[in-house]
Curated annotation (Swiss-Prot):
It is found in: Cytoplasm. The keyword Chaperone applies. Gene3D superfamilies: GroES chaperonin. PANTHER family: 10 KDA HEAT SHOCK PROTEIN (PTHR10772), CO-CHAPERONIN GROES (PTHR10772:SF58). InterPro entries: Chaperonin_GroES, Chaperonin_GroES_sf, GroES-like_sf. Belongs to the GroES chaperonin family. It comes from the Bacteria. GO terms for molecular function: ATP binding; metal ion binding; protein folding chaperone; protein-folding chaperone binding; unfolded protein binding. The gene is groES. Disulfide bonds: none annotated. Keywords: Chaperone, Cytoplasm. This is Co-chaperonin GroES. It comes from Macrococcus caseolyticus (strain JCSC5402). One of its GO terms (biological process) is chaperone cofactor-dependent protein refolding.
Length: 94
């Protein structure tokens, strides 16, 4: 498992459906890229100039929407994750 550093979070992307409601199977190039996923790990937070630590505002298990081009894709074994900074998270899905 990945352990993010500082104000970074690890997200497991939510995959889009590969078949439309009418039964058409989409190829990888036809699928719309998703920018939604589930937080699987959070860093320790950002450290301010005065040494104070600011905790990250999301928790493991939160479903989030993030900037479409934010973060770095990391593969470990068969799993693929996005590691991004907390400020690249747009919203928590409730």
């Amino acid at each position: 498992m990945l352990k993010p550093y500082g104000n970074r979070v690890v997200i497991q992307k939510t995959e889009r459906e590969t078949t439309t409601a009418s039964g058409i199977v989409l190829t990888d190039s036809a699928k719309e890229k998703t920018n939604e996923g589930t937080v699987v790990a959070v860093g320790t937070g950002r450290i301010l100039n005065n040494g104070e630590r600011v905790e990250i505002g999301v928790s493991v298990g939160d479903r989030v929407v993030y900037e479409p081009f934010g973060g770095t894709e990391v593969k470990t074994g068969d799993e693929s994750y996005i590691v991004l900074k907390e400020e690249d998270i747009i919203a928590i899905v409730e």
